[in-house]
Regions:
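N-terminal regions of proteins, emphasizing targeting and processing segments when present
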Residues: 8-11, 32
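Sec-dependent signal peptide recognition
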Residues: 1-8
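N-terminal signal peptide c-region/cleavage motif recognized by signal peptidases
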Residues: 13-15
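Serine-dependent protease modules
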Residues: 18-298
């Protein structure tokens, strides 16, 4: 009898644990179609360096050396003017994005489409469209692109301010080109500032993000986009549990300016501010290390 009771309690605990885990299937089915794969092609011209040969007379003692070791007819050989023909090749890259309006406007990261000569957007129904960049902002890593299509499925937007640390979130994207891949995790922190990014209060998560996920959406459990997956912190180049997303309200403010005025307008207060450390507080005779110090006036 006791064994039966133990087994029953064990099965009950398993059932309770399973019920406590989130189910993402409905979210993916409803909103996954608004996530796209982005591929770019960039034409790169690489100039070949020619040997730097001084202009020497035939009676110069080094003339024979350069004549022998630089092939005849090659630019740079005595008597052969000109430079080598530049070498051209294509650079291809992959990223993710998502549709924000039914008439073909999409958001992605600026670094996904930077310097691209051709941008191709692939929908989940396998249709492909050429896209053009409406505008981009390197400081926030946001780009607004457009495809010529209508009746598209668009995402719903949420409020990142309402996110709580520990809340479940989900990412959809194309890591390493594997389209419509779904990963999930929790919000690890809010308002993170990275050394190279002074304009973005990042959402930190432990959602698995890899190359190709950049520009894809971060969903809350209500199926609303709360961020754009942008970068990871890693010592190896691979995912190590530290992912960072741009809050969607920041992204929408940027895209609104790009769409309406074509550029980003930012205010400046003309001062450089730094955090008051314990050492600074002691040197100024402060009771606690709090507040901010105006370090310089521009």
């Amino acid at each position: 009898m006791s064994r039966i009771l133990v087994v029953a309690l064990f099965l009950f605990s398993l059932g309770a644990s399973a019920q406590g885990l989130p189910d993402f299937t409905e979210l993916v089915e409803k909103h996954g179609a608004a996530v796209v794969n982005i591929s770019t092609t960039t034409q790169i011209t690489q100039r070949r360096g020619a040997p730097q040969v001084p202009q020497l007379d035939e009676d110069d003692p080094f003339y024979e050396f350069f004549r022998r070791f630089i092939p005849r007819g090659q630019p740079g050989q005595p008597g052969q003017p000109g430079q080598p023909a530049p070498r051209q090749f294509e650079s291809r890259s992959l990223g993710s994005g998502f549709i924000i309006s039914a008439d073909g406007y999409l958001l992605t990261n600026a670094h996904v489409v930077e310097a691209a000569d051709e941008i191709t957007v692939k929908l989940t129904d396998k249709r492909e469209f050429k896209a053009k960049v409406i505008g981009s902002d390197k400081r926030t890593d946001i780009a607004l692109i457009k495809i010529e299509a209508t009746g598209l499925p668009a995402v719903r937007l949420g409020d990142p301010a309402k996110l709580k640390v520990g809340e479940w979130v989900l990412a959809i994207g194309s890591p390493f080109g594997f389209e419509s891949s779904v990963t999930a995790g929790i919000v690890s922190a809010k308002g993170r500032t990275l050394p190279s990014e002074n304009f973005v209060p990042f959402l930190q998560t432990d959602v698995a993000i890899n190359p190709g996920n950049s520009g894809g959406p971060l969903f809350n459990m209500r199926g609303e986009v709360v961020g754009i997956n942008s970068q990871i912190y890693s010592r190896t180049g691979g995912f190590m549990g530290l992912s960072f997303a741009i809050p969607i309200d920041v992204a929408m403010d940027i895209q609104n300016q790009l769409r309406t005025i074509g550029k980003i307008s930012r205010g400046r207060i003309g001062v450089v501010i730094q955090e008051v450390s314990k050492e600074l507080a002691e040197s100024f005779g402060l009771k606690s290390a709090s507040g901010a110090l105006v370090n310089a006036v521009e």
